[in-house]
């Protein structure tokens, strides 16, 4: 069966897997975010241990024609450390919640990383030369005796082994009372937003000691709280527009030209609920876990527990497309509630041409949907299919009756194995899928 990816028929094949194969995975090693940079040449992951690992794409060469989708470690650094809030007697985890790249302006790369409370701007730069021949100190850094200096030297640059440095340039702190769930860089390349459960703040990349509160849904009496903010993102082209989603399954589009505080939205997107299908779990499964604008800016995609929806910004009443991710779990909601899986936050992503979308599921399955043909495919990130250039076989889940050879029964799904974080290369058919502590990279195999 052909893959889903936009345009020509092709199959997905294995390229690489990063991370240890251990059965007992340390909590700190679990990947918590995955993000390509604007060119797709760099791929960053963050984990629950506060580390950021950046991979760089290998250049194609004639001796290894299949290396175009391969990424190797470029830089690793500790972004966040565990902290303790003494005023509230709360531990602040080091877990990286989100990474967002800034568009590249010069030889260096910049990215934002955040944990629950603190956002940091990192500069990733290369050094392949060092200065030698100082007058006041030796090459090893020791100060020279000024009485022994008899001649003036002109320092020179000497080549050295390539060294990649990650240095923190800005720290944006003390602006969020609740846990940060989103950061999004604006198209003006000067500002970005950060969102927590009840507020959205606007920052300037050069100013760390203050931010502007642009959304505040906190009620005067917290007992009247009925919803929380779950995700927020800037429009890719209009720097005055952004959206934020809620735990009630609604999306609000805001225009910062209307007012400084965007409590009154410009557009309100909500799908009417079918009263006949209402249940105890309806509100939980309608909570939106991710919202992403298409690259064109015409559409936005939202992910709730069971489905992905595509909305036209010009139509607020209902989504233009709805894709069922794992409808077979609807009958299992009670047990998923008991083991807390129903609160899992799945992300979603677009391909470069906005013609296909991808999101994760359980059992290390991930789903792709072709918006033009309406075809969909379920693939699995597993060590069994991790032979170089091995074609991924489509997987199917059966809900009862006789199980075919290649199918897996819904009762056999492993809910501890889940694909929450995925990323699609901005131009090529290369995808990155985080499965617990492993990062799988797949690419197309053109027929």
UniProtKB/Swiss-Prot annotation:
Keyword Signal (UniProt): no
InterPro entries: PP2A_PR55 (IPR000009), PP2A_PR55_CS (IPR018067), WD40/YVTN_repeat-like_dom_sf (IPR015943), WD40_repeat_dom_sf (IPR036322), WD40_rpt (IPR001680)
GO molecular function, one term: protein phosphatase regulator activity
WD repeat coordinates: 26-65, 91-132, 175-213, 224-264, 283-321, 338-379, 414-447
Annotated compartments: Cytoplasm
One GO CC term on file: protein phosphatase type 2A complex
Cytoplasm in keyword set: yes
Taxonomic superkingdom: Eukaryota
GO biological process annotation, one example: cell division
Alphabetized Gene3D superfamilies for the sequence: YVTN repeat-like/Quinoprotein amine dehydrogenase
UniProt entry keywords in alphabetical sequence: Cell cycle, Cell division, Cytoplasm, Mitosis, Repeat, WD repeat
Function according to Swiss-Prot or TrEMBL: Substrate-recognition subunit of protein phosphatase 2A (PP2A) that plays a key role in cell cycle by controlling mitosis entry and exit. The activity of PP2A complexes containing ppp2r2d (PR55-delta) fluctuate during the cell cycle: the activity is high in interphase and low in mitosis. During mitosis, activity of PP2A is inhibited via interaction with phosphorylated ensa and arpp19 inhibitors. PP2A complexes containing ppp2r2d (PR55-delta) also regulate the activity of TGF-beta/Activin/Nodal signaling by restricting receptor activity.
PANTHER family (alphabetical): PROTEIN PHOSPHATASE PP2A REGULATORY SUBUNIT B
Subunit structure: PP2A consists of a common heterodimeric core enzyme, composed of a 36 kDa catalytic subunit (subunit C) and a 65 kDa constant regulatory subunit (PR65 or subunit A), that associates with a variety of regulatory subunits. Proteins that associate with the core dimer include three families of regulatory subunits B (the R2/B/PR55/B55, R3/B''/PR72/PR130/PR59 and R5/B'/B56 families), the 48 kDa variable regulatory subunit, viral proteins, and cell signaling molecules. Interacts with ensa (when phosphorylated at 'Ser-67') and arpp19 (when phosphorylated at 'Ser-67'), leading to inhibit PP2A activity.
Note: ppp2r2d is an abundant subunit in egg extracts and represents 70% or more of B55 subunits.
Record family assignment: Belongs to the phosphatase 2A regulatory subunit B family.
Protein name: Serine/threonine-protein phosphatase 2A 55 kDa regulatory subunit B delta isoform
Organism this protein belongs to: Xenopus laevis
């Amino acid at each position: 069966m052909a893959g889903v990816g936009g345009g020509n028929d092709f199959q997905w094949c294995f390229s690489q897997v990063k991370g240890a194969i251990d059965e007992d995975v340390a909590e700190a090693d679990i990947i918590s975010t995955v993000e390509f940079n604007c060119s797709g040449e760099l791929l960053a992951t963050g984990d629950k241990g506060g580390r950021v690992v950046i991979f760089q794409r290998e250049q194609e060469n004639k001796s290894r024609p299949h290396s175009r989708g391969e990424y190797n470690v470029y830089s690793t650094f500790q972004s966040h450390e565990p902290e303790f809030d003494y005023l509230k007697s709360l531990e602040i985890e080091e877990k990286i919640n989100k990474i967002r790249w800034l568009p590249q302006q010069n030889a260096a790369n910049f990215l934002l990383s955040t944990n629950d409370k603190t956002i940091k701007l990192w500069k990733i730069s290369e050094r392949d030369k060092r200065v030698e021949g100082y007058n006041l100190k030796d090459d090893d850094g020791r100060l020279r005796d000024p009485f022994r200096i008899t001649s003036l030297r002109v320092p020179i640059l000497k080549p050295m082994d390539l060294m990649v440095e990650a240095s923190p340039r800005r720290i944006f702190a003390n602006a969020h009372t609740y846990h940060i769930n989103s950061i999004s860089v604006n198209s003006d390349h000067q500002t970005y937003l950060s969102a927590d459960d009840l507020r959205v703040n606007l920052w300037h990349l050069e100013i760390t000691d203050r931010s502007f509160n642009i959304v505040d849904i906190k009620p005067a009496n917290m007992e009247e709280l009925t919803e929380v903010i779950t995700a927020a993102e800037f429009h890719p082209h209009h720097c005055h527009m952004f959206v934020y989603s809620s735990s009630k399954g609604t999306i609000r589009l805001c225009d910062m030209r209307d007012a400084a505080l965007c409590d009154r939205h410009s557009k309100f997107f909500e799908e009417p609920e079918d009263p006949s299908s209402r249940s105890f779990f309806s509100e939980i499964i309608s909570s939106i876990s991710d919202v992403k604008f298409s690259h064109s800016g015409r559409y936005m995609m939202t992910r709730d527990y069971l489905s992905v929806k595509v909305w036209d910004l010009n139509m607020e009443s209902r989504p233009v497309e709805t894709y069922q991710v794992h409808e077979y779990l609807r009958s299992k909601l009670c047990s998923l509630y008991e083991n807390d899986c129903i609160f899992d936050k799945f992300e979603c992503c677009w391909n470069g041409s906005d013609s296909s979308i991808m999101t994760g599921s359980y059992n290390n399955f991930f789903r792709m949907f072709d918006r033009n043909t309406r075809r969909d495919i379920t693939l699995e990130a597993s060590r069994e299919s991790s032979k170089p250039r091995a074609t991924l076989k489509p997987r199917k889940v059966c809900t009862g009756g006789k199980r075919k050879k290649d199918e897996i029964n819904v009762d056999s799904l492993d809910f501890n194995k889940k694909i929450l974080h995925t990323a699609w290369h901005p131009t090529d058919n290369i995808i990155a899928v985080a499965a617990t502590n492993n990062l799988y990279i797949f690419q197309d195999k053109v027929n």
